[in-house]
UniProtKB/Swiss-Prot annotation:
Pathway: Cofactor biosynthesis; coenzyme A biosynthesis
UniProt EC number: 2.7.1.237
EC class (word): transferase
Function summary: Catalyzes the GTP-dependent phosphorylation of the 3'-hydroxyl group of dephosphocoenzyme A to form coenzyme A (CoA).
The name this protein goes by in its record: GTP-dependent dephospho-CoA kinase
Source organism, top-level taxon: Archaea
Annotated source species: Methanoregula boonei (strain DSM 21154 / JCM 14090 / 6A8)
Gene Ontology biological process terms from the UniProt entry: coenzyme A biosynthetic process
Reactions catalysed, as given in the entry: 3'-dephospho-CoA + GTP = GDP + CoA + H(+)
Record flagged with keyword Transferase: yes
Keywords: Coenzyme A biosynthesis, GTP-binding, Kinase, Nucleotide-binding, Transferase
Length: 168
């Protein structure tokens, strides 16, 4: 398990890609691409626009409250535990498996926000990872070598632990 120390949390407030004010502005960029989504609202918005993400990572929450607009489950649903501020081995394993077995919905018990990092690492080149940036819009990240390197660099900010419970 990777645990994000409190002193490193601020590094993850900035968008990890290009910020767009609403989903409508990114739709043209998604045509013909493999799309991976993280977050209930962005996944629901994609589905409302006729796009089924190859992988949808959701947790039933929006800004720490129950999500009113739940996305539909596409393909098999993998349930994983991922406490806030962590990236569990279970989540990484599910993402790695899902990349080769799409479409898949990964339902997280805990928090899915940080799933963007291992998803960018696992996703094939030229695919797109899209996620919601609370109160700002959606973030689009085209997966290329630079994105994978940046994701691996962000992962170095975490503490690797074998403990199933984070110690913050």
């Amino acid at each position: 398990m990777f645990v994000l120390p409190d002193e490193s949390r601020q590094l993850f407030k900035d968008p990890f890609g290009t910020l767009h004010r609403d989903i409508g502005t990114v739709l043209p960029e998604l045509a013909g691409r493999t799309i991976y989504s993280v977050g209930d609202v962005v996944t629901h918005s994609l589905q409302q626009n006729g796009i089924t993400p190859a992988i949808a990572v959701v947790d039933g929450q929006t800004m720490r409250s129950p999500c009113i607009k739940m996305p539909e489950i596409a393909g098999p649903c993998i349930h994983v535990k991922n406490p806030p501020g962590t990236i569990t081995d279970e989540l990484v394993s599910a993402l790695t498996h899902a990349v080769d077995h799409t479409p898949v919905t990964i339902l997280v018990d805990g928090e899915e926000d940080l799933a963007v990092i291992p998803l960018v690492i696992a996703a094939p080149l030229s695919s797109i990872v899209i996620y919601g940036q609370p109160n700002e819009g959606v973030v689009l990240r085209i997966v290329d070598d630079q994105a994978k390197t940046a994701a691996r660099r962000l992962l170095t900010q975490f503490t690797k632990t074998e403990s199933p419970i984070p110690h913050n």
